[in-house]
Amino acid sequence: MMSPKIEKQTVFVVDDEKIIALTLELILIQKGFDARSFVDPLDALYAARIVAPDLLITDVVMPQMNGIELAIHFKVDCPNCRILLFSGQGATNDLIQNALAQGHAFELLAKPVHPDELMETIEQILHSSGSRA
């Protein structure tokens, strides 16, 4: 008798700094996630149409599209996807306040972050009963 296959949770990481995106992807893979990294938010949006992720981790300040705009697109295209914003930029507060004023609330994690803190936050988001996105 075969044991049931446990589905890996899919996590998309979007950061315009390639080294950060790849590092987070590797950490998540080591922790058992199906992680995919993107430096272009539009590539992540396209990929989500093929495989909807369980979680989107995105930088906030990026040149092509900011992370809040990306998160709002994900909320429409992938309503079950949880979202974690990730930023080290001071300008983030204004963007977050603007999103809140438009009715969008997101979790925010400050860069740099220790991998243990990242994993703890991811577990809380993925296992919370209500949608945090």
Q: Where on the chain are the PLM-derived regions?
A:
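Active-site beta3 strand of CheY-like receiver
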Residues: V51-I57
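Two-component/phosphorelay signaling modules centered on CheY-like receiver
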Residues: K18-R36, G103
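Short hydrophobic/Thr-rich beta-strand motif most characteristic of the beta2 strand and flanking loop
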Residues: G32-V39, A47, L109
